[in-house]
From Swiss-Prot:
This is UPF0494 membrane protein C212.04c. It is found in: Cytoplasm; Endoplasmic reticulum; Membrane. Belongs to the UPF0494 family. The chain crosses the membrane at residues 107-127, 144-164, 174-194, 198-218.
Length: 288
């Protein structure tokens, strides 16, 4: 007779004994008696799927970011080039660091402007007529000095005011021109953006409209900037300032010393210095 255990093994499905040896029954294939995908394998597969999705996402988004970065870098380079060119143009038209007050005609012009201002004040307030009437009433010469002192004091005050305020005005006008230029650039940029968005509905005329408005604003800013420059040049001539050119700058014969200071060296002193260096370099005689 056959052994009942052998019959039992034939009746039992495959993997029946292994079924109870596994702690998690849900992860077992009942037909083959094999373990299903373990959590580690499942985690690895999920990580691979996530990585594939992330790579797909980065492959689609990264080129767009690169294009945006290229555009922003081009805009930055364009703005930097525009700023450098404008600064060169501005420095050529407004030589603020090369203006000298050593012109001989400066004080003559300031005196003339002070006298003109006094005459204008006198014409408006009629100081001269009242002064002549006062002289006719008071025949004493000692009483005439009061109005004269007033005129002299007013003249000195105006002369010092013209001297000090003219320097401030000449220094402030280049800054005002920079403000005018940058305000014009900002207004032009905003107007171009607004007109481009409004005229975007009519694609055929959007470029023409934006270019026309930008050109009109640029022309207005240019006229204002040029008019400001004319005022600047007129004030330089009127107040007796002098623009120092490269030819006017005299190079002094100063040489740096060992302490970093500068000292005047004539031809005689240079020759004596060379002789001293030669004497120092000569070998000393050895005593026998």
């Amino acid at each position: 007779m056959s052994n009942p255990e052998s019959l039992k093994k034939q009746v039992e499905p495959p993997g029946y004994n292994e079924l109870f040896m596994v702690e998690d029954v849900c992860n077992v294939d009942l037909e083959q008696g094999l373990d299903l995908c373990k959590p580690e394998k499942v985690n690895k597969q999920s990580q691979r799927s996530r990585q594939s999705r992330q790579s797909l996402f980065t492959n689609t988004i990264k080129p767009q970011k690169d294009k945006m970065n290229i555009k922003t870098n081009k805009i930055k380079e364009f703005l930097n080039d525009l700023f450098t060119e404008f600064s060169k143009f501005h420095n050529s038209y407004y030589p603020n660091g090369r203006i000298s007050t050593q012109d001989k005609s400066r004080w003559v012009l300031l005196i003339i402007w002070s006298i003109i201002t006094i005459l204008t004040i006198d014409k408006k307030f009629k100081i001269k007529e009242s002064y002549l009437e006062w002289i006719g009433e008071n025949q004493s010469h000692s009483e005439i000095w009061g109005p004269i002192v007033i005129y002299v004091g007013l003249f000195i005050l105006l002369l010092s005011a013209f001297n000090y305020c003219s320097k401030l005005i000449i220094k402030a006008l280049p800054l005002i021109s920079m403000v005018i230029a940058w305000v014009g650039v900002v207004i032009a940029a905003f107007s171009v953006i607004i007109t481009a968005t409004i005229a975007g509905v009519i694609a055929a005329f959007s470029v023409i409209i934006t270019a026309t408005i930008a050109g009109v604003i640029a022309a207005m800013v240019g006229i204002l900037y040029f008019g400001h420059w004319l005022v600047y040049k007129i004030l330089i001539l009127a107040f007796g300032f002098k623009i120092v050119t490269s030819g006017d700058v005299c190079v002094s014969n100063t040489l740096p010393t060992h302490n970093g200071e500068t000292a005047l060296h004539s031809d005689a002193t240079v020759g004596s210095d060379i002789e001293q260096i030669e004497l120092q370099n000569m070998p000393t005689p050895v005593k026998k």
